[in-house]
Regions:
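A conserved ligand/cofactor-binding region detector
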Residues: 1-810
């Protein structure tokens, strides 16, 4: 070890000891792993804070144009390891922790995941923040500081149970409370006309208090900001009620306001839950817009140049009410005339759509919006009036066209269409894969595209290689470093250099040893969390994502049962041992998804305890899936299941993370699977099933799922076993309604239509896995082809084509 490195390591060790004494308040020789995590985090926080302040000063002095990224969720995961890597302090911290006989990875494991998101939407936002900082974009993320996240998942008797995720109960070293940054956010009341203007009267008020988290760039001194809002009641408690013994009433007003920032996506199956969701969306959007305008006016004397200095991006429709809120602020508070305000608004906003399913496009009842946001509803009506007048000139005498375009759905209960508001109020709208973006303008947004064909574009998603390869898979990263050098972390296209090594027996041996080590780690985690012992020498077949019918976890289960029945029928055949791994959460009110989780456990209980099967087949469900769990699963996967019905998955990013770690994909021609196939080669991916045009044609011609049940004996046997209670003997009809729905016309996502192709393709997977050298060659080819799927590339495209922001190199 060099003298300079010793000096640095010694300095970091001294800082750790100092923070144990001064910040954590423990004697160094009595420090627990949690104490050490807190102390090391403070060492990193100190360095990041210096860079952060310098970044803000530089951007303020340069009066840089900034992107403001509004997202309901940011699934950040843990921060410590990422921060130490960004600061190039990982080795120094590891050496410093050696004084306490502890490893850096064990210390980092004591940090809870930040419960600020749920699925792909939030993880994409987190990857984007990482890339914005790394490529040097002046940027600001805005969201909500959820105290309890969405929920932590537990499994009881095979059923998902939800409980709060109190990730903040011991505080977090990564946030900076901003006591001086608080904004009022109003709800309710009514609108009156006074002096020719609309005035919002008698609204209730909650305070939005700012908490900042730092987002370090890699290979740069830049540190960006994620500002999160906490809801604070205007008065803490009703002291009079408290003093009379009415303790519930004393706290009721406080809870009514502050529950806005308690939980991500509260159950919306009740009127109160729906109202709370709308309040959440407006709460963070209003505070964020007030904040960005206040910052702008500190740097510029006028709002006339707002669109030149700020690009506001809507990550899906949750922040779409921001279009009406910016108009309210400009017109009502800044006295800007309507046409000028609207022109400014449209130049400022851009919008990413994340779904192709019409039923998933967010809408709000007009009556609810009238109750919660009466002024905004009035503004939306005015925006709609002017937009429809313009649209009528584009296509005269076509009322059906105007009805589809309208911001208000007049069929049945009147509802505000938030996607339509986002499109009308933005200058650019993007999808997140080439197929998705094409389908947007061909299907759900075709009418808008006929008016504004240039408004729509594509930005294929990406993932940050710093977390999903360098951090999640350190052994593979070391192999890449010794083969390619270290700069692939900032230029993922360099992975193409692996193509020259994919047939190299020595390189393959190293690659396969690393894969097995990661599988051993994953197997230990499965035994610890799911209580099931699995063999790392079996194929690890992985489907980890939100549980949803369109993602077709149920199709995967049908294949598992098919395989189980085949093993029992042909026990002496040379079966490829396989461990099928599921993980993911079902929304608390989504009963079908919860039934799928229960079925996975019921099927697993039978298969895993059948001595006739042994290690030939195991089925496991890993509970409480999140970023840190994914960092264990992704490196250990052999096969990546990406099996959504073609035309339903906008992009997917789990497919990218798994391929980046050397898993082969079995999937439909959907979302980003198509682009993965184009980049890794047709021979290095397993594609099955109907393509999007075939799905559409079959649906239009009249899809009869019973035909497949009647004509495919293996499928009939599987469905009969499920419906007949083979996997639920304590309640034989538990899954009868599920099977009846599949056969009787409820198979909307065409599981039965794709079943035969899926099962046949799984046999091809087995055939390849029997030849380890060929499998390894294709796994390496997958890693080599993943350069284009860096979120750095995605963000550079956003910056160039949508936000028009130049990187600020530090």
């Amino acid at each position: 070890m060099s003298q300079s490195l010793m000096n640095t390591s010694t300095h970091v060790a001294a800082q750790i000891e100092e923070h144990l004494l001064k910040t954590v308040g423990v004697l160094p020789n009595e420090a627990t792993l949690t104490n050490l995590m807190q102390a090391v985090s403070q060492v990193a926080r100190e360095q990041l804070s210096r860079r952060w302040v310098a970044t803000q000063a530089r951007e303020k002095a340069a009066k840089s144009r900034r992107v403001v990224y509004l997202s309901m969720e940011f699934l950040m995961g843990r921060t410590l390891s990422n921060a130490m890597a960004a600061l190039n302090m990982t080795d120094d911290a590891s050496n410093g922790l050696a004084n306490y006989a502890q490893k850096m990875e064990d210390v980092a494991d004591r940090e809870p995941d930040a419960a600020l998101g749920n699925g792909g939407l939030g993880r994409l936002a987190a990857c984007f923040l990482d890339s914005m900082a790394t490529v040097g974009l002046p940027s600001f993320g805005y969201g909500i500081r959820y105290e309890y996240g969405m929920f932590a998942q537990d499994i009881q008797a095979g059923c998902q149970t939800e409980y709060p995720d109190p990730w903040l109960q011991n505080g977090t070293p990564w946030e900076f409370p901003r006591a001086d940054i608080t904004y009022p956010v109003r709800f309710g009341g009514w609108v009156e006309r006074a002096n020719g203007k609309s005035v919002w009267r008698n609204a209730g008020e909650v305070a939005a208090k700012a908490y900042d988290m730092v987002i370090p760039g890699h290979g740069t001194e830049k540190v960006s900001t994620l500002r999160l809002w906490k809801a604070v009641a205007p008065a803490h408690i009703d002291l009079n009620a408290f003093n009379t013994g009415d303790y519930a009433r004393a706290a009721s007003a406080k809870n009514e306001y502050e529950n806005i920032s308690w939980v991500l996506y509260p159950n919306d199956s009740t009127p109160a839950g729906r109202e709370l969701r709308l309040k959440q969306e407006y709460f963070f959007v209003s505070a964020s817009i007030q904040d960005l305008i206040a910052r702008h006016l500190k740097e510029h004397p006028t709002l006339a140049n707002l669109a030149d200095k700020v690009a506001i991006h809507l990550n899906d429709t949750h922040p779409a009410i921001g279009v009406a809120e910016l108009m309210r602020v400009l017109c009502d508070e800044q006295n800007m005339v309507w046409d000028e305000a609207w022109a400014l608004c449209c130049k400022t906003f851009s919008y990413t759509n994340h779904t192709l399913m019409p039923e998933a496009l967010e809408t709000w009842p007009v009556a609810l919006m009238q109750h919660v946001l009466p002024r905004h509803l009035e503004l939306i009506f005015q925006i709609n009036k002017e937009f429809l007048e313009m649209a009528a000139r584009h296509r005269p005498n076509d009322n059906a066209f105007l009805s589809r375009l309208s911001l208000i759905d007049e069929h049945g209960e009147r509802r505000v269409r938030m996607a339509n508001l986002s499109i009308v109020g933005s200058h650019k709208v993007n999808g997140v894969s080439a197929l998705h973006s094409d389908l947007l303008v061909q299907t759900i947004f075709a009418d808008f595209a006929s008016i504004w064909p240039d408004r729509f574009t594509n930005m294929t998603n990406g993932v940050t290689p710093r977390r999903w390869l360098a951090q999640a898979n350190p052994e593979l990263s070391s192999l890449l470093d010794s083969t390619l050098g270290q700069s692939w972390r900032l230029n993922l296209d360099q992975l193409q250099g692996l193509n020259s090594r994919k047939s190299d027996a020595v390189f393959q041996k190293s690659f396969m040893e690393i894969k097995r080590n990661n599988k051993v780690r994953l197997a230990a985690y499965i035994e610890r969390t799911a209580g099931i012992k699995v063999s790392p020498d079996s194929m690890f077949d992985v489907q980890v994502k939100r549980i949803h019918e369109y993602k077709r976890q149920l199709l995967n289960v049908l294949h598992v049962i098919t395989r189980y029945q085949a093993i029992l029928a042909n026990p002496d055949e040379a079966w490829v041992p396989r461990t099928v791994i599921f993980a993911g959460k079902a929304a608390s009110s989504y009963h079908t998804a919860k039934s799928i989780i229960r079925l996975i456990h019921d099927v697993g209980s039978v298969i895993n305890n059948d001595p006739r099967v042994g290690d030939k087949l195991k089925l496991v469900f890993i509970p409480n899936y999140g970023v840190s769990v994914a960092e264990i699963i992704m490196p250990g996967a052999d096969l990546s299941e990406q099996i959504s019905t073609a035309g339903t998955e906008a992009s997917g990013t789990g497919n990218m993370k798994l391929a980046l770690n050397g898993a082969l994909t079995i999937g439909t021609d959907d979302g980003a699977n198509i682009e993965i196939r184009q980049n890794v080669g047709d021979d290095n991916i397993f594609i099955f099933g109907l393509k999007t045009p075939e799905v559409q044609a079959l649906r239009q011609s009249g899809y009869i799922s019973r035909h497949y049940y009647d004509s495919l004996p293996a499928l009939k046997s599987v469905l009969d076993a499920v419906a007949g209670g083979q996997f639920s003997p304590d309640e034989p009809n538990r899954y009868g309604p599920m099977v009846d729905s599949l056969i009787g016309g409820g198979d909307h996502y065409m599981l039965l239509a794709d079943y035969a192709s899926y099962v046949e393709t799984q046999l091809r997977v087995d055939d390849l896995y029997r030849t380890p050298a060929k499998w390894c060659e294709r796994a390496i080819a997958n890693v080599a082809g993943m350069g284009v799927f860096s979120s750095d590339r995605t963000i550079r495209e956003y910056a160039r084509q949508i936000w028009h922001i130049e990187p600020d190199t530090l």
